[in-house]
């Protein structure tokens, strides 16, 4: 895995690790957890933790892995931005959804362009997948906009982020907030 990561073959390294942990005893899984923390692979930690949890084995550290974005200064609470990033991408900065949402915060291109204009930076499609800080900045600015729109209600903000503000408004009208 180290050689794969060092040679830029991140996807193969991640695949190797997720398959390897299927055969490891708990003590070696704990060693793998430390390795993944050292190599700053929180999204692989989440994958390992979820896979083991589905088998009835609990490794809380990887299941609740934190991302370095916790140390950044964003316009919304860290808990909200981390929860959205973990749910949307499992902290994988390279993931693209079937509908085109991209990066750690899974932002749709049109929304990302709008947020880039709002903060005065150039929209760069490539950076959406290669620079998690850029992606997180645009995503958290969008979360801030939604928080202002929905009165900082975390449920409605989360629904709006995932399904769009119109659906969140319809849901709120139908079910109350």
Language-model-derived ranges and their functions:
Residues 1-156, 163-177:
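Cell-wall glycan-active module
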């Amino acid at each position: 895995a180290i050689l794969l990561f060092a040679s830029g073959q991140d996807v193969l390294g991640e695949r190797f690790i997720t398959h390897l942990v299927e055969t490891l005893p708990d003590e070696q899984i704990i060693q793998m957890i430390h390795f993944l923390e050292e190599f700053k692979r929180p999204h692989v930690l989440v994958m390992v933790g979820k896979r083991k949890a589905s088998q009835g084995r609990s490794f809380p550290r990887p299941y609740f892995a934190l991302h370095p974005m916790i140390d950044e200064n964003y316009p919304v609470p860290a808990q909200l931005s981390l929860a959205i990033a973990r749910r949307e991408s499992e902290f994988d900065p390279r993931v693209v959804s079937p509908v085109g949402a991209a990066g750690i915060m899974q932002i749709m291109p049109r929304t990302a362009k709008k947020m880039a204009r709002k903060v005065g930076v150039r929209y760069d499609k490539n950076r959406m997948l290669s620079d998690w800080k850029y992606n997180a900045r645009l995503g958290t600015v969008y979360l801030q906009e939604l928080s202002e729109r929905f009165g900082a209600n975390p449920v409605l903000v989360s629904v709006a982020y995932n399904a769009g503000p119109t659906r969140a408004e319809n849901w709120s009208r139908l079910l109350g907030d």
